[in-house]
């Protein structure tokens, strides 16, 4: 694994107390190399905006716009064969509203034949209690996948190890012109102080036919005993047909062509191209990679951005096939990408 590094390492302690020697500034120059290789062409359903979900509605829908109450909430992009799904959203309760927010990922088969979706690897965790954010050493061994900080960290670790979490079946089959659920899980906040929780999900799947996918948000419903229950398939279907984009929205991104001034990358909601970056790292013009001399160093950037190339002029962000106008222009950070 390569670590993201800057071309210069600077160590300095500001605002030193009186009578304490001013720390020495140490500059260690090093080479910043372009990472060879490229992303593959596997599409990624990437649902991360709005990150903080305060209201019910559509988070990301690739369904057709036709016959929907809010056409602008749908991106009209089907999937077939291999594709990935990445979602990350946060729920936050209020002083008088601690209802459990559910995230649902619904799939529709528009064809005249049954479609089977094989769930190759998949994991979904909440930050509390599954994977809290904790302080960790800069480097730590993780041979069996029990070291993580945050739900995204744990989900990615499982998928890279070829695991499929127990909450996911090996496959689902969807009848012609019918719906199915890939995910219907809570983001509980009721017992937390403060009442904030997040869920990260990463799935690698293969579909035998064409399908549409949507990531949705609904609060738990009440059963006849007054207890919370998960939304039903029919209730999720209704969100697809009549729901609008969940609000409030995240910050609108800075236009991608803007190269100066303040910068907002924005959060991703759409379909990106590229699930895996494969590279053979060698010295320029050679077939091998030599270690630097004693005292020397070189680095490769990981997840470099259009305005954060660290001097390499290389933008590694996955391109968006479809997106909402108020969300990120590219999949900045390449979340969930191997």
What are these regions (language model features)?
Residues 22-82:
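N-terminal, Lys/Arg-enriched amphipathic/low-complexity engagement segments
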Residues 74-75, 169-172, 326:
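Beta-strand-rich interaction surfaces with strong enrichment in secreted/lumenal proteins
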Residues 78-80, 88-100, 104-106, 192-194, ...:
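Short, solvent-exposed beta-strand/turn "edge" segments of beta-rich domains on protein surfaces
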Residues 80, 98, 167-180, 274, ...:
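Solvent-exposed, conformationally flexible loop/turn segments
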Residues 89-95, 99-101, 106-115, 121-125, ...:
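Asparagine-centered strand-capping/turn motif at beta-strand->loop junctions
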Residues 134-191, 338:
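Intrinsically disordered, low-complexity Pro/Gly/Ser/Thr-rich segments with frequent PxxP/GP/PP motifs
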Residues 188-232:
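Terminal connector regions
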Residues 232-338:
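Helix-biased "structured C-terminal domain" signature
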């Amino acid at each position: 694994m390569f670590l993201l590094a800057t071309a210069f390492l600077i160590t300095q302690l500001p605002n030193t107390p009186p009578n304490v020697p001013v720390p020495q500034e140490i500059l260690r120059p090093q080479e910043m190399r372009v990472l060879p290789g490229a992303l593959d062409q596997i599409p990624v359903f990437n649902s991360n905006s709005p990150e903080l979900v305060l209201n019910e509605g559509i988070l990301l829908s690739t369904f057709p716009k036709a016959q929907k109450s809010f056409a602008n909430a749908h991106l009209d992009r089907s999937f077939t064969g291999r594709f990935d799904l990445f979602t990350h959203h946060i729920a936050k309760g209020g002083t008088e509203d601690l209802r459990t927010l559910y995230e649902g990922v619904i799939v529709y088969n528009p064809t005249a034949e049954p479609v089977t979706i094989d769930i190759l690897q998949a994991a979904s965790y909440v930050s509390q209690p599954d994977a809290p954010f904790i302080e960790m050493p800069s480097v730590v061994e993780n041979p069996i996948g029990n070291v993580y900080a945050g739900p995204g960290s744990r989900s990615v670790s499982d998928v890279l190890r070829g695991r499929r979490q127990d909450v996911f079946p090996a496959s689902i089959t969807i009848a012609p012109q019918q719906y199915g659920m890939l995910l219907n899980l809570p983001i509980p906040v009721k017992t937390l102080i403060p009442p904030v929780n997040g869920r990260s999900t990463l799935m690698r799947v293969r579909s035998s036919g064409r399908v549409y996918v949507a990531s949705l948000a609904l609060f738990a419903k009440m059963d006849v005993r007054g207890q919370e229950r998960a939304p039903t398939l029919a209730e999720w279907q209704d969100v697809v047909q009549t729901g609008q984009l969940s609000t409030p929205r995240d910050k609108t991104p800075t236009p991608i062509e803007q190269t100066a001034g303040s910068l907002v990358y924005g959060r991703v909601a759409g379909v990106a191209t590229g699930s895996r970056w494969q590279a053979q790292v060698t010295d320029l013009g050679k077939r091998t990679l030599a270690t630097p001399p004693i005292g020397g160093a070189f680095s490769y950037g990981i997840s470099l951005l259009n305005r954060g190339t660290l001097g390499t002029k290389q933008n590694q962000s996955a391109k968006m096939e479809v997106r909402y106008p108020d969300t990120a222009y590219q999949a900045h950070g390449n979340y969930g990408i191997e």
